[in-house]
């Protein structure tokens, strides 16, 4: 039977390993990945238009969701929230966005939907926060 001090040391070693792994994941630089996006998340644009704007786009809503979630799943976990922010684009520069101002469907309505794409009711993908949620999705909170 292991002594109490050996158990404490083993527990400490396991915790240090976990914290080191989490720190390594959180420190991945998303900049090189983000710079390769020409049209950010093109399948998600169709899905957002279908769901937020009730605009019919080619293909079924189910297929649009699957393609959008697939695009998001291909993005490293720690970069997903940043990718969604990039997709939404700054309000001051709509030309740098994956979203378009549409008649009867302003970008704000679309942005509200984009904010929930990773949540359990939609793509259910973990993010940098190790949950299926992105924090600080308001433009004023972007760093």
Curated annotation (Swiss-Prot):
Post-translational modification: Five disulfide bonds, which are essential for the inhibitor activity, are probably present.
Keyword entries, A-Z: Alpha-amylase inhibitor, Disulfide bond, Protease inhibitor, Secreted, Serine protease inhibitor, Signal
CDD domains xref list: AAI_SS
Species lineage: Eukaryota, Viridiplantae, Streptophyta, Embryophyta, Tracheophyta
Endpoints of the signal sequence: 1-24
Function: Alpha-amylase/trypsin inhibitor. It could be involved in insect defense mechanisms.
UniProt miscellaneous comment: CM proteins would be involved in the cooking quality of pasta.
UniProt source species: Triticum aestivum
Protein name: Alpha-amylase/trypsin inhibitor CM16
Entry similarity comment: Belongs to the protease inhibitor I6 (cereal trypsin/alpha-amylase inhibitor) family.
């Amino acid at each position: 039977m292991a002594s109490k001090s050996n158990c404490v040391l083993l527990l400490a070693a396991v915790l240090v390993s976990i914290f080191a792994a989490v720190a390594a994941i959180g420190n991945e630089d998303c900049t090189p990945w983000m710079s390769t996006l020409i049209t950010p998340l093109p399948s998600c644009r169709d899905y957002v238009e279908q769901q937020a704007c009730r605009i019919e786009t080619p293909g079924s809503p189910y297929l649009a969701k699957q393609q959008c979630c697939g695009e998001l799943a291909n993005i490293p976990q720690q970069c997903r929230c940043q990718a969604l922010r990039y997709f939404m684009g700054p309000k001051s520069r709509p030309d740098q966005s994956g979203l378009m101002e549409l008649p009867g469907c302003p970008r704000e309505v679309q942005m509200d939907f984009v904010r929930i794409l990773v949540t359990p009711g939609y793509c259910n993908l973990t993010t940098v926060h190790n949950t299926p949620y992105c924090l600080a999705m308001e433009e004023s909170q972007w760093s």
